[in-house]
Swiss-Prot record:
Residues 417-440 are annotated as: Disordered. This is Tubulin epsilon and delta complex protein 1. It comes from the Eukaryota. Acts as a positive regulator of ciliary hedgehog signaling. Required for centriole stability. May play a role in counteracting perturbation of actin filaments, such as after treatment with the actin depolymerizing microbial metabolite Chivosazole F. Changing residue 269 to R: Found in patients with primary microcephaly; uncertain significance. Keywords: Cell projection, Coiled coil, Cytoplasm, Cytoskeleton. The keyword Coiled coil applies.
Length: 495
C-alpha cells in the first residue's frame, strides 16, 4: 500500500515562509546587519551568534561612520558601551548587565535588547536617514541645544604640572586664527554656491527647484573643468559636459532625471560613445583611468541606498510576523525574579579588594561635606552683616540694581524659550538650499531671512554672556593680583 500524503495548509506554509523574509529584510535595513541564521541561533541562545549581535547593537547605539576609529574597537569595549547606552535609555532587564563581555554567551538576551530598541522607535528609518546620500545642497538648521553627542564621550585630559600662561595665549591665538580661517572658507563656499545656483537657473526638470545642485553641476562641468585622462599617447582634456552623441540614443534634454538615466545607460553600455569617449570607459583598453568612475561610484551608492530603502519597506510590511516570532523567543526565556523589580536596572561591579578604599572615600566625602556646610554658614553670616551695614549706601544700590537687571534678563530669556516651545515647532534637521526669484515659499519651507534673524538674536545673547564672563574673569584676576603684592599684572590690549 502506498503512503498517505499529508495535507499541507497553504496559509501555514505562507506564514512559515514570511518569517525568513521578514528577518532578511530587517538584516538588510540595518548597518552591517547579520544574516538571518544569526537571529535563528540567537533564539536558542547559541554562543556563535553573540559577537555579531554585540557589534550590531554597537552600530545601532553609536551611529559612527565606517572610517571612524571607534568603529573598530575591541569586542569587550563595544559590549561595555552597549551596556551603558542601554542602561541610560532605561532597558528594564537586569540579565543584560550580568552578561560576560567576551562574547561567550547571551545571544538571546541581546536579541531581546535589539527587539526592545526596535519597539521604542523607528531604528531602520533612523539608520537610513543617517547614511543617506545628499544630492542637493543642504544646510542643517537646528535651534535646539544638543544634549548629548552620538557615541562615547571624549576622554578628559588633565594637565600633569603647571601650565605656562604664554602657552595658553599661544593656543588662544591659534584657535582664533583657525576660527577666522573657518569663517572665511564658509563665506567663500556660500559665494560659490550662490554662483552655481544662479548660473544653472532653469536647467532642472523640477520646476520647484529651478536650478542644479553642486553634485548635479559636477556631472555637467564645462570643458575647462574636465578631467585629464591619460590615453595611449599624449594626455587629452576631455569634455565632461553632456555628450551630444547621447541625444540620438537617449532621451533629449538637460534635466537631471534624463541625465541620470542616460548616465546609467552610458555606464552599462560604453559602446554608445564615440572613440574618444569610449576609450577611457573600456576596461580592457590602454587607459589606466576611468572617465566615469566618480559617476559610477555615485550611482552604485544610490543603488545601495535604494536597496536599503526597499528593505525597510519590506520590513514594515512583514513586521507583524517578526513580533509574533519574538513572542515565542520571549516565552523561552526564564522569568526574572520578582525582587529584581525593586532593584536598579544596572549594578556596577565593585572588586572585593577595594572595599576598604571605598569606605575611606566615603569618610572623606562626609568630612568634606561638613566643611562645606560650615564655610557656607560663615559666608552667609558675613554677607548678612555686610548687607545690614550698608543697606542704604551707593554701593549697595548699584549691586542691587545690577542683580535686578541680571535677573530680568534671565527671566526674559526663559520666557522667550517658553513661548517658543509653546508655539509652532522650530526648524530642525537638514534643509535643501533653493534659490527662488519669485519669493514664493511653501508651508514647510524656511526663508533664509528668518534663519539669519534668529541666528543674529542668538549671537547677541551669546555675546552678552561672553562679556559677563569676561568681566567675572577680570574681577577674579584683579583679586588674585591683589593677593600677591609682588606680582605685576599687564592686561592684554583691547581687541
Amino acid at each position: 500500500m502506498g503512503r498517505r500524503r499529508q495535507r499541507v495548509d497553504p496559509a501555514a506554509g505562507a506564514r512559515a515562509g514570511a518569517l525568513p523574509e521578514a528577518i532578511a529584510a530587517l538584516s538588510r535595513s540595518l548597518p552591517s546587519g547579520p544574516s538571518p541564521e544569526i537571529f535563528r541561533r540567537a533564539k536558542f541562545d547559541r554562543p556563535e551568534a553573540t559577537s555579531a549581535l554585540w557589534q550590531l547593537l554597537f552600530r545601532v547605539l553609536s551611529p559612527l561612520p565606517a572610517g571612524n576609529a571607534l568603529a573598530s574597537l575591541a569586542l569587550e569595549v563595544q559590549a561595555r558601551l552597549v551596556k551603558s547606552a542601554l542602561c541610560s535609555q532605561g532597558y528594564p532587564r537586569l540579565a543584560l548587565a550580568q552578561l560576560p563581555e567576551d562574547g561567550s554567551q547571551g545571544s538571546r538576551e541581546l536579541l531581546l535588547a535589539l527587539s526592545w530598541l526596535l519597539a521604542r522607535g523607528p531604528v531602520p528609518e533612523q539608520m537610513l536617514a543617517q547614511a543617506r546620500v545628499p544630492l542637493g545642497d543642504e544646510m542643517t538648521v537646528c535651534q535646539c541645544e544638543a544634549l548629548a553627542s552620538p557615541g562615547p564621550p571624549a576622554p578628559h585630559m588633565e594637565a600633569e604640572g603647571p601650565v605656562d600662561v604664554r602657552h595658553v595665549q599661544w593656543l588662544m591665538g591659534k584657535l582664533r586664527f583657525r576660527w577666522r580661517q573657518l569663517v572665511s572658507s564658509q563665506q567663500e563656499q556660500c559665494a560659490l554656491l550662490s554662483k552655481i545656483h544662479l548660473y544653472t537657473r532653469g536647467c532642472h526638470s523640477d520646476q520647484s527647484l529651478s536650478h542644479l545642485s553642486v553634485t548635479e553641476a559636477e556631472m555637467l562641468r564645462d570643458p575647462e573643468g574636465g578631467q585629464q585622462v591619460s590615453g595611449a599617447g599624449a594626455a587629452q582634456n576631455l569634455d565632461l559636459a553632456y555628450p551630444k552623441c547621447l541625444h540620438s540614443f537617449c532621451t533629449p534634454g538637460m534635466g537631471p532625471r534624463t541625465f541620470w538615466n542616460d548616465l546609467w545607460l552610458v555606464c552599462e553600455q560604453p559602446g554608445l560613445l564615440p572613440g574618444d569617449w569610449a576609450a577611457p570607459l573600456d576596461p580592457g583598453g590602454a587607459s589606466a583611468c576611468s572617465l566615469l568612475s566618480p559617476f559610477r561610484a555615485l550611482l552604485r551608492t544610490l543603488e545601495r541606498e535604494n536597496q536599503r530603502l526597499e528593505a525597510v519597506l519590506a520590513w514594515r510590511r512583514s513586521e507583524l510576523v517578526f513580533w509574533r516570532w519574538m513572542d515565542t523567543v520571549l516565552g523561552t526565556c526564564a522569568p526574572e525574579v520578582p525582587a529584581a523589580a525593586s532593584q536598579p536596572t544596572f549594578l556596577p561591579w565593585v572588586p572585593e579588594r577595594g572595599g576598604g578604599e571605598l569606605d575611606l572615600v566615603v569618610r572623606e566625602l562626609q568630612a568634606l561635606e561638613e566643611e562645606l556646610r560650615e564655610a557656607a554658614e560663615r559666608r552667609r553670616a558675613a554677607w548678612e552683616a555686610k548687607a545690614g551695614g550698608c543697606g542704604r549706601g551707593p554701593e549697595w544700590s548699584a549691586a542691587r540694581r545690577a542683580s535686578r537687571e541680571a535677573v530680568e534678563k534671565e527671566l526674559g530669556a526663559l520666557q522667550q524659550c517658553w513661548e517658543r516651545d509653546g508655539g509652532p515647532a522650530q526648524p530642525h534637521g537638514p534643509h535643501r538650499l533653493v534659490r527662488r526669484e519669485d519669493g514664493a515659499a511653501g508651508d514647510r519651507d524656511l526663508r533664509a531671512a528668518v534663519v539669519i534673524r534668529t541666528l543674529r538674536s542668538q549671537e547677541a545673547c551669546l555675546e552678552a554672556v561672553l562679556r559677563r564672563l569676561q568681566g567675572q574673569c577680570r574681577q577674579e584676576l584683579a583679586r588674585l593680583v591683589g593677593a600677591r603684592p609682588g606680582l605685576i599684572w599687564i592686561p592684554p590690549p583691547g581687541r
